[in-house]
Amino acid sequence: LNFEWLKKIASSDCVLREKMTLFWANVFVCRDNHILHIIQFNNTLRNHALGDFGAFVKAVSRTPSMLKYLNNNRNVKFKPNENFARELLELFTLGLGNYSEQDIKEAARAFTGWNFKPNGDFILRTNKHDENPKTFLGISGNLGGDDVIDIILKQRQCAEFICKKIYTYFV
């Protein structure tokens, strides 16, 4: 896929969009053998490559490829799976050392029930979602996945982490 992106970058009317799409694909890494799901993932990267970072994170987090890759499609209220929450915090938004293990556990609970329909559309399976109060990065309430992402985005460290990645990529 990277070779195809390089060809697209070379022939695109919007070189910056394609370069940022490739950049985001190397930050929000996932693998999927389902061709339609990976196309949807790549299109999500492209559609949000130059837009609002919060909308981008929420959209990427809902793609079947990301849900499967980090096992969030198996994240249910009585057995939370921490893979997606951990990667969201460590690799995608804040960086190591800027959250606690308890924050990971609480974020995992907030993302319970996130899944996708056979056609690839996102669905929140409410019967598998933990509706109980959570405390994440010092904020308490009946938090869902979008709330966790919003809290992350309010952290100065998130901006610094992403800006450093972009700077390193371009410079």
Describe each region flagged by the PLM.
Residues 1-48, 73:
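N-terminal accessory alpha/beta regions
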Residues 5, 38-171:
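Active-site substrate-binding loop specific to GH73 endo-beta-N-acetylglucosaminidase modules
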